[in-house]
Amino acid sequence: MYKRSLIAASLSVAALVSAQAMADINGGGATLPQQLYQEPGVLTAGFAAYIGVGSGNGKAAFLNNDYTKFVAGTTNKNVHWAGSDSKLSKTNETNPYLSAHGSAWGPLIQVPSVATSVALPFNKSGSNAVNFADVNTLCGVFSGRLTDWSQIPGSGRSGAITVVYRSESSGTTELFTRFLNASCSSTLEGGTFAITTSFGSSFSGGLPAGAVSAQGSQAVMNALNAAQGRITYMSPDFAAPTLAGLDDATKVAQVRGVSPAPANVSAAIGAVTPPTTAQRSDPNNWVPVFAATANPNDPSVRPYPTSGYPILGFTNLIFSQCYANATQTQQVRDFFTRHYGATANNDTAITNHRFVPLPASWKLAVRQSFLTSTNNLYIGHSNVCNGIGRPL
């Protein structure tokens, strides 16, 4: 009798542990914020460890509830959220998701998490600061028009330039190609840069000769450091191990005389206003993107700033408004409460990773919309999520 009771108790404990493991809030995606989200305490209770696989895989995992995009071969887990520096396409991603899954899973939420620069670390010995005073020089390096360090005025260096780029679908690539698309002269470069998550297909004239690819931020940095003459585009916390490192122009290039340190993008970010109350029901309006000029038909498109470090953007969070499990619903609310809190929040960790916390006005807009029970956008709103939600 005792033995049977012991076995039964053991099975009950095993079932409980298994249920708890399966109930983790699983997420992953962009590698740009990977180190931030893996910092202890940034993700709140109930969240599984963040898995960095690139923005493209993160979006695909969430939109199709496909955990194999995080871990190949693992089919017994669900996906509950994603990180992406690449904004969801309303036409190609958000609307198809709502058509396929909206009735069963509910609406999705897309909001900015932190603001970021895109730095230009390089591996070429020399004592001179490297400064792309003229953006056309930067464009020439990444189009392949300029092939030697001596063609970068004032660099004090010579030898072949080798571009290192992300091989997978990357939101960091999208942020960078947005800038190239808006800033580079097609006449001078002999082609154009498309806004894309795939750098290999961005420039219409093809990749620079000898360009080297790698998958993920850390692998790109490893490739950068493997040989002299290499340059890449990178999130600030991978580009340099310290804040002071971002200001070291012998290792991380300046653009127009300005380093990618957070202080040099914070003013531009502070000038970006959150969506109005009437605009907040559309996930597209929550994520600002930069372009050469504003778009009168899309309030999320803002012109690039004319001062400060110019290559900048946001990394974003993608969640569902509805979760089938009440505990998970509350855990998602708890994370939003922490991340977008007025006083107790993740700002210290964000700053330590060389990112820029969202302005107070943005955090307030998020709390008003997704954490206020009387708002129709409230996470788990009973009128929206009655009997539906992303699976446990």
From Swiss-Prot:
A GO molecular-function descriptor: alkaline phosphatase activity
Annotated signal peptide: 1-23
Mutant lacking the gene: phenotype: Strains are still able to make extracellular appendages that include PstS.
Locations listed in the record: Secreted; Periplasm
EC number: 3.1.3.1
One cellular component term from this protein's GO annotations in UniProt: periplasmic space
Record Pfam families: PBP_like_2
Keyword terms, alphabetized: Hydrolase, Periplasm, Secreted, Signal
Subunit composition and interactions: Homodimer.
The family this protein is said to belong to: Belongs to the PstS family.
UniProt protein name: Alkaline phosphatase L
Annotated source species: Pseudomonas aeruginosa (strain UCBPP-PA14)
